[in-house]
Amino acid sequence: MYLPSCTYYVSAPDFSSVSTFLPPTTSCQMTFPYSSNLAQVQPVRELSFRDYGLEHPTKWHYRSNYAPYCSAEEIMHRDYIQPPTRTGMLFKNDTVYSQRGSSNPSCNFYTTVGRNGILPQGFDQFFETAYGISDSSNYEQLTEKSVSTCQSITASEKVSSGQEKESATEKSTVESSGTSATEKNSLSTALRCRKKRCPYTKYQIRELEREFFFNVYINKEKRLQLSRMLNLTDRQVKIWFQNRRMKEKKLSRDRLHFFTGNPLL
């Protein structure tokens, strides 16, 4: 008998063991839209074990090309490999982009570093095809050439920097020498432009001292008279009297300090 509410088919002998709690069958016949000739339905237990892998793992085969000794983490990394780009399609005959079911490569695809020191060993073939490297000797020659070129570039940069420093020092010395020469020239011109000092004669000093002895401050008329008499300018007479007053003030202070002994005076 087939019950619509059940997901599996109950056979006749099993149905005889069910208790009679169901209502008695009526005389009316029920029609179903589906065919009554249904295929044998598998038990739910078998389906659940098959779908969720609850049975022994040896019963079911692997559905991918991963080797049984690969760990789950490595398989996950392999599943997230990016698809080939336009440049990668050029190497479609290589083993990296071949069909998955063709071969089972080793699981340590990204564990070791390749020749270039950055990419894994799986990319060595691309490195070789790009630079034309056939074996390790050629690769060593290429690395030696690159190192030599780097050293030559650094040496040339050092030489150029040294030359620039030398040129800068030469320019600084030239500028300093030029500034010192200009300063010397300016000093020489200033000394040349300065009027030569001409001291007063004994006669002029005696007459000026006599006038200062009588009058410390001299008026303009007397100053003009002395200038005409001593053959001096009005400004020279005026400056001489100013200096003589300052000198007299200093001498009077020294005399007062000598006689009184007070250093504050």
Curated annotation (Swiss-Prot):
Organism, by scientific name, is Heterodontus francisci
* GO terms under cellular component: nucleoplasm
Q: What are the DNA-binding region positions?
A: 193-252
What would be one Pfam family of this protein?
Answer: Homeodomain
Listed transmembrane segments: none
Compartmental location: Nucleus
| Residues spanning the signal sequence | none
Q: What protein is this chain from?
A: Homeobox protein Hox-D11
